[in-house]
Amino acid sequence: MDRLQEALAQCGRLVIDGSMSTALEHLGCKLNDKLWTARVLAEHPEYVKEVHLQYLRAGADCHITCSYQATVPGLLENGFTAPEAAEIIRRSVRVFREAREEWWEREGGRESGRVYPIGLAGIGPYGAYLSDGSEYVGRYGVDDETLRAFHESRIRLLLEEKPDYLLFETMPSFREVLIAAELAEKSGADYWVSFSCLDGKHICEGDEIRQCAETLSKGHPHLKVIGVNCVKPQFVESLIHELKAGCDLPVIAYPNSGETWEPVQKIWYGGAEKVSFGEHARRYYAAGAAAIGGCCTTVDFHIRQVAEVRRAFAG
């Protein structure tokens, strides 16, 4: 029984953390930068650790490292040397590990009755490196070898720090997911996959998510979880049903709070959903999701709502 199975056996349902970027902004960090959260990881890792601690205290069981935008080519293009880039990427796993141990040993985590927190090494798509909103579109215009080289270097560096799982997240392209899965399978590492989606049935490049789940779940023994993230809350119930119809893997969802992303100015606009995030979580768990969390524009407040719903749901 692996870490995920143990946690699900203990709790029935799990809670994923919330947005790293929004929480960092609330701490005063400026993120209008091509490296986005990776700039903070490089220059002020203490803020990243504080965000992890906030989500640990809020009740999250599964935590994503601050490595979504931390890529070797991106760091090199922004003035870091190759050794510095490698260190920054590896640091993302260590910073979470430090926060986890501090919470577990010094803040009562061990006595809380909660599961030992799961660390997910976050890996964003090629579109995140482009920093132009392509993670919501796909169709990058590059060949398979370019995608393979892009993902291989970061996978290798993250695995040197032995995270619990790799997490390929906000993936708009099924072709890219298959390449990433091939690399993870070759490494022998267990991994999760989470898609960005157009609507309640299709990933951003237009493929039916049910078919993606059906295809991906065959011949990939190290794939442990499939899900969606960075999507509008109103699409999630349908997406959960589609994923569950396509495979037997645990399904996760961590949507945005409801705003829309503007990639040029790098801002979110529009009001958040009037329905509470906790009420959304209740419906997602009822639809069969194994774990729920938040993506962009969510903070520890939202995750506390999810954790409260999970407790009631499990009870």
Task: Please place each PLM-identified region on the residue numbering.
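Domain-level signal for soluble alpha/beta catalytic cores
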Residues: 1-315
